[in-house]
């Protein structure tokens, strides 16, 4: 199993995923950064893409058959600007697509579902199986 052979490479990504699904009383930009860092780490370690926009577009296209992601309309520009702003505290006027508050929370929610799909596929689940798992789940982290 690939996931077992790569357990050290997947460990930090798995840890970020686990951290992202733990209940927290308040959402913050750190929660967004944890998810986007895990997605970037996944792509850097297991995919060929090196540019965040390309990473996102590739993953969104790859998992477009997943029901829970079909209507998410993840905006790559919002993800990139938000990541750059919250990681480097750049001037917000230079990152006009930066999200905050409820919008950032919703974006993080969508990205977490994408990350879950990446991990499930990595450990060997096909798209039909991922669809079945997510559609049958009543976990509130997958319901939007």
Language-model features, listed with the residues they occupy:
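Amphipathic, oligomerization/interface secondary-structure segments
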Residues: 1-144
């Amino acid at each position: 199993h690939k996931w077992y052979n790569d357990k050290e490479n997947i460990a930090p990504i798995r840890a970020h995923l686990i951290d992202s699904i733990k209940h927290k009383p308040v959402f913050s930009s750190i929660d967004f950064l944890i998810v986007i860092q895990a997605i970037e780490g996944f792509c850097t370690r297991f995919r060929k893409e090196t540019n965040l926009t390309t990473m996102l577009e590739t993953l969104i296209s790859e998992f477009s058959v997943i029901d829970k992601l079909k209507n998410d309309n993840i905006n790559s520009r919002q993800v990139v600007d938000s990541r750059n702003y919250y990681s480097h505290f750049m001037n917000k006027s230079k990152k006009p697509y930066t999200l905050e508050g409820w919008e950032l929370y919703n974006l993080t929610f969508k990205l977490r579902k994408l990350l879950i799909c990446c991990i499930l596929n990595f450990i060997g689940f096909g798209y039909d199986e991922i669809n079945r798992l997510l559609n049958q789940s009543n976990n509130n982290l997958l319901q939007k």
